[in-house]
């Protein structure tokens, strides 16, 4: 099974146990991962600048926060796996909430959730990670709009922004496009 076939809202509709097996495993993995030394190097570099640094990331793992970066200086353009939303927001609500109480139990061999499916706090239906997936018309981006607004405000104050792009691929070019916009003529988001 390819990444795009499980990393989409339809997977939660067709096989929620498998979808949550995949995302539950990722959630647990990210919770247990300690940020590597590169995060500390970036943090120290950012502290050398008068206006500090601002993180633009497509990673959904929360590692920048875990590494001690200011959460008010992070824009997670694809959301966070540590936040949940209703799988059917048009039928329920567009609220999000932290996944801190979720403790998924996963059968690693089958990649299936063996514990109870996470439920929407508002309607009791299926919950899903609040991350932008492939073919995703239901992602609730509202929590990240405030992050984006803070980034835009910060960029207006920086005369010559230094962009350090790490690990940005070609398959999903969101980070590369952002870097190019900042580098070319100081364009904003």
Predicted regions and their residues:
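Conserved catalytic alpha/beta core of Sir2/sirtuin-type deacylases, generalized to analogous enzyme cores
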Residues: 1-189
């Amino acid at each position: 099974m390819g990444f795009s076939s499980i990393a989409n809202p339809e997977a939660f509709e067709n096989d929620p146990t498998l979808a949550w097996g995949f995302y539950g495993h990722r959630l647990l993995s990210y919770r247990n991962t300690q940020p590597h030394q590169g995060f500390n190097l970036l943090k120290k570099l950012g502290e050398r600048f008068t206006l500090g640094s601002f993180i633009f990331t497509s990673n959904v793992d929360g590692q920048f926060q875990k590494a001690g970066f200011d959460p008010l200086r992070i824009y997670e353009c694809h959301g966070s796996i540590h936040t949940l939303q209703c799988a059917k927001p048009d039928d329920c609500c567009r609220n999000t909430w932290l996944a801190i109480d979720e403790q998924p139990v996963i059968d690693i061999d089958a990649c299936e959730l063996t514990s109870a499916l996470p439920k929407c706090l508002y309607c009791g239906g299926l919950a899903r990670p609040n991350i932008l997936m492939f073919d995703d018309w239901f992602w609730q981006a509202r929590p990240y709009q405030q992050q984006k607004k803070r980034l835009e405000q910060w960029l207006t104050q920086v005369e010559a922004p230094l962009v350090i792009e790490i690990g940005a691929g070609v398959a999903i070019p969101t980070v590369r496009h952002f870097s190019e916009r900042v580098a070319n003529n100081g364009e904003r988001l």
